Amino acid sequence: DAIDRIINRLEQEKYIDEERFCRAFIHDKYRFAKWGKIKIGQALQLKKIPQRVFSPYLNEIDEDEYLTILNNLLMTKRKSVHAENEFELTNKLVRFALSRGFEMKDIRHCITLSDENDNLE
């Protein structure tokens, strides 16, 4: 009974708040851990946070910053990957980005941009 009162009080005063937690978790994971939206969403679901709570905050992620993070990850990975041809390299980069939780449309976009930049040089 006392525990319930304490928890209720903490929730009323916003010390315990799922939305605040989601906002901070999403911000930290995409900015510092460089996770994609899919992996962040899965991690929040594992923490028993309802999708209706975290989905709006995932959509608030700045698209340009998100793509810049993905592009930088792919450029760094490209330097360390050993592949016999362009097809194998692309597959390895796609698998890497998918494992980080990025969406296929964003991965394809960044790989295409990277290939276009390589052709310009």
Residue ranges of predicted features:
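An alpha-helical, amphipathic repeat domain used for nucleic-acid recognition
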Residues: 1-121
